[in-house]
Amino acid sequence: TLRLLARGDTVVGIDNHNNYYDPAIKEARLDRFIGHPSYKHLRVDLADREAIEEAFSTHRPKRVVNLAAQAGVRYSIENPLAYINSNIVGFAHILEGCRHNGIEHLVYASSSSVYGANTKTPFSVHQNVDHPLSTYAASKKSNELMAHAYSNIYGLPTTGLRFFTVYGPWGRPDMALFLFTKAILANEPIKVFNYGKHRRDFTYIDDIVEGIIRTLDNPATPNLKWNSDQPDSATSNVPWRVYNIGNNQPVELMDYIAALEKALGKQAAKELLPLQTGDVPETYADVDDLVEQFDYKPNTSVEDGISHFVSWYRDYFKV
């Protein structure tokens, strides 16, 4: 939102401000631009069809970025229906709003979790992704399929972005970096799953934003070379595309923790635990398509990204 406002765009933001995590951080995040003359905020739920219809018909956006979702692989195991209502029903309402209002381009957040049971790395958008390991992953794969149907039937240009382990200032408090930082500063042990042998393609928030902006400004187009006898999973003969946005440099969890310890100036007490149900041992993004088509590749190092996060955390929480 800040990037779009800074370049002169008018933005309408939608958030239901639920209590999946502390709403106070959501309000503080919003306070940074709520007073901007080119920003309008709507406190509605994507699952509220009438409210979304009204938002589209009243504000008539030209382009749509849908980053709203019920997030979290682990919570999806406990409460799968929350993911159906938000991520599938809510996304259907976004698609309908786009269809009926002549939207130029819909960009939406998919996830690296769609790679599920795949083990060949780096994960490529040209791989088959039909074996999700969680309801969250299945909901994100569903978004890609729903978008394709709308691109095919209604000619709606859609672009899905598979984000890889996003971190940085103003992130969700249920994410590992947030939990680790809070625990270390409180002299409490951190829970390290898979005995710290996880490898993640940690991607800094500013790099994610840059990827969103670049794809948003280039509406999806049909792949004129698409072959239905050998269908490419990343493109289509309709205006539909998917891309990975990841750092293309997986980091072992123990090294990630070491970078956090350095930034905090404190050592962590570690509680080593087995791999959790629904989790995957490694993520690693192939970003060749992103580089080729948008001349862009995320490049913020984990050390720099964590340092920025710790500076923000200390300032926000006054610790």
List PLM regions with ranges.
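A cross-family signal for key residues in well-ordered alpha-helices
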Residues: A92, E96, L145-H148, T181-K182, ...
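Hydrophobic alpha-helix immediately C-terminal to the catalytic Tyr-X-X-X-Lys motif of short-chain
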Residues: S142, M146, Y150, F180, ...
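C-terminal substrate-binding subdomain of Rossmann-fold SDR/epimerase-dehydratase oxidoreductases
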Residues: R3, I184-V319
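N-terminal Rossmann-like NAD(P)+-binding domain of SDR-like oxidoreductases, especially those catalyzing
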Residues: T1-V166, L216, Y296, H308, ...
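Conserved GTPase G-domain signal focused on the G5
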Residues: W170
